[in-house]
């Protein structure tokens, strides 16, 4: 029975590793495609809209995030006996926090931008923000930078505190028990800072719903028939924000699981599972943005046609080869 569970564990880890690699590849391809399309459009038109600037920055941050995760996984699984000092751990945490921070905050700026562009309120403060949407995005990013600096400082203080506590009993290198407990504390700290963009995104989401409801109620009183352009824009923005929240919830869930069962961080199967769940957010959210953007969708269409033609050609060649083998047998 013990042998059976060992085989099952190996199969599960191999399956999750394949899923993880596939997620990494398609995530880098999707985000790289967005950067390429927007940069080509920028070279062609000599200018880039605010939405495209945010989408490009978001894609670049997620490419960095996915590449960083890939390097981290290679180091963890290829060099299991590698001795890590407290300074190395701090560098790893700072890079991880930096990648997550920009990926989440730029996505939050995108939801704020959608809200200010599409929502319709007669409130004077809202109109003030709506007319100064670029400044709102700039201030949001500036606040996020201040929070990033504070997050990194507190994380470094946390790792230094654990180092000083355990330095009396063990060497300067990190034991697996120490690393798991330190990782749990860092994740708790990270969750606290992640709550700020969550609250901001949730607020814009609820206000978008309220704006859609008031607009729909107003339209029912004056116009009979299908949706107007503003209602359609509301629905598209809501679909994008809902998809963002679902994937973001999965990301938060992966972090909470690591906090709840931090002692399992010593097991490779649990680590790979958490990474598979964690990567779903930066990978699949990029494809949702591609589907929701007309320019990206149109640019992606020729690639889909080429891929379909390649698949058809491969299937035809496979059938021809199979038929040739049957003829040779008979």
Swiss-Prot record:
<feature type="topological domain" description="Extracellular">
    <location>
        <begin position="1"/>
        <end position="16"/>
    </location>
</feature>
<keyword id="KW-0812">Transmembrane</keyword>
<feature type="transmembrane region" description="Helical; Name=1">
    <location>
        <begin position="17"/>
        <end position="37"/>
    </location>
</feature>
<feature type="topological domain" description="Cytoplasmic">
    <location>
        <begin position="38"/>
        <end position="53"/>
    </location>
</feature>
<keyword id="KW-0297">G-protein coupled receptor</keyword>
<feature type="transmembrane region" description="Helical; Name=6">
    <location>
        <begin position="240"/>
        <end position="260"/>
    </location>
</feature>
<feature type="topological domain" description="Extracellular">
    <location>
        <begin position="261"/>
        <end position="269"/>
    </location>
</feature>
<keyword id="KW-0472">Membrane</keyword>
<dbReference type="GO" id="GO:0016020">
    <property type="term" value="C:membrane"/>
</dbReference>
<keyword id="KW-0325">Glycoprotein</keyword>
<dbReference type="GO" id="GO:0004930">
    <property type="term" value="F:G protein-coupled receptor activity"/>
</dbReference>
<keyword id="KW-0716">Sensory transduction</keyword>
<feature type="topological domain" description="Extracellular">
    <location>
        <begin position="75"/>
        <end position="95"/>
    </location>
</feature>
<feature type="glycosylation site" description="N-linked (GlcNAc...) asparagine">
    <location>
        <position position="76"/>
    </location>
</feature>
<protein>
    <recommendedName>
        <fullName>Taste receptor type 2 member 117</fullName>
    </recommendedName>
</protein>
<feature type="transmembrane region" description="Helical; Name=4">
    <location>
        <begin position="136"/>
        <end position="156"/>
    </location>
</feature>
<feature type="topological domain" description="Extracellular">
    <location>
        <begin position="157"/>
        <end position="190"/>
    </location>
</feature>
<keyword id="KW-0919">Taste</keyword>
<keyword id="KW-1133">Transmembrane helix</keyword>
<dbReference type="Pfam" id="PF05296">
    <property type="entry name" value="TAS2R"/>
</dbReference>
<feature type="transmembrane region" description="Helical; Name=7">
    <location>
        <begin position="270"/>
        <end position="290"/>
    </location>
</feature>
<comment type="similarity">
    <text>Belongs to the G-protein coupled receptor T2R family.</text>
</comment>
<dbReference type="GO" id="GO:0033038">
    <property type="term" value="F:bitter taste receptor activity"/>
</dbReference>
<feature type="transmembrane region" description="Helical; Name=3">
    <location>
        <begin position="96"/>
        <end position="116"/>
    </location>
</feature>
<feature type="topological domain" description="Cytoplasmic">
    <location>
        <begin position="291"/>
        <end position="330"/>
    </location>
</feature>
<keyword id="KW-0675">Receptor</keyword>
<dbReference type="InterPro" id="IPR017452">
    <property type="entry name" value="GPCR_Rhodpsn_7TM"/>
</dbReference>
<feature type="transmembrane region" description="Helical; Name=5">
    <location>
        <begin position="191"/>
        <end position="211"/>
    </location>
</feature>
<feature type="topological domain" description="Cytoplasmic">
    <location>
        <begin position="212"/>
        <end position="239"/>
    </location>
</feature>
<comment type="function">
    <text>Putative taste receptor which may play a role in the perception of bitterness.</text>
</comment>
<dbReference type="InterPro" id="IPR007960">
    <property type="entry name" value="TAS2R"/>
</dbReference>
<feature type="transmembrane region" description="Helical; Name=2">
    <location>
        <begin position="54"/>
        <end position="74"/>
    </location>
</feature>
<keyword id="KW-0807">Transducer</keyword>
<feature type="topological domain" description="Cytoplasmic">
    <location>
        <begin position="117"/>
        <end position="135"/>
    </location>
</feature>
<feature type="glycosylation site" description="N-linked (GlcNAc...) asparagine">
    <location>
        <position position="169"/>
    </location>
</feature>
């Amino acid at each position: 029975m013990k042998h059976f569970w060992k085989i099952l564990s190996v199969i599960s880890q191999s399956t999750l590793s394949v899923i993880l690699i596939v997620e990494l590849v398609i995530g880098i391809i999707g985000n790289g495609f967005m950067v390429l399309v927007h940069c080509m459009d920028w070279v062609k038109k000599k200018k880039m809209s605010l939405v495209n600037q945010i989408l490009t920055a978001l894609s670049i941050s997620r490419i960095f995030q996915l590449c960083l995760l890939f390097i981290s996984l290679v180091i963890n699984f290829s060099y299991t006996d590698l001795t890590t000092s407290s300074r190395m751990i701090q560098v790893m945490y700072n890079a991880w926090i930096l990648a997550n921070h920009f990926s989440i905050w730029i996505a939050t700026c995108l939801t704020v931008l959608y809200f200010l562009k599409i929502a319709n309120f007669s409130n004077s403060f809202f109109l003030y923000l709506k007319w100064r949407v670029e400044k709102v995005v700039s201030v949001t990013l500036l606040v996020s930078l201040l929070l990033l600096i504070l997050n990194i400082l507190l994380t470094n203080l946390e790792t230094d505190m654990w180092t000083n506590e355990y330095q009396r009993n063990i060497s300067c290198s990190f034991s697996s028990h120490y690393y798991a407990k330190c990782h749990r504390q860092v994740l708790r700290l990270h969750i606290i800072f992640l709550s700020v963009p969550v609250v901001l995104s949730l607020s814009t989401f609820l206000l978008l719903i309220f704006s859609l409801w008031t607009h729909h109620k107003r339209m029912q009183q004056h116009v009979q028939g299908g949706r107007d352009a503003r209602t359609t824009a509301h629905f598209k923005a809501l679909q994008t924000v809902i998809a963002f929240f679902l994937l973001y919830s999965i990301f938060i869930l992966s972090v909470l699981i690591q906090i709840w069962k931090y002692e399992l961080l010593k097991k490779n199967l649990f680590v790979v599972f958490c990474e598979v769940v964690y990567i779903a957010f930066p990978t699949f959210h990029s494809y949702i943005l591609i589907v929701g953007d007309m320019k990206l969708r149109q640019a992606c269409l020729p690639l889909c046609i080429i891929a379909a033609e390649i698949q058809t050609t491969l299937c035809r060649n496979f059938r021809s080869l199979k038929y040739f083998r049957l003829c040779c047998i008979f």
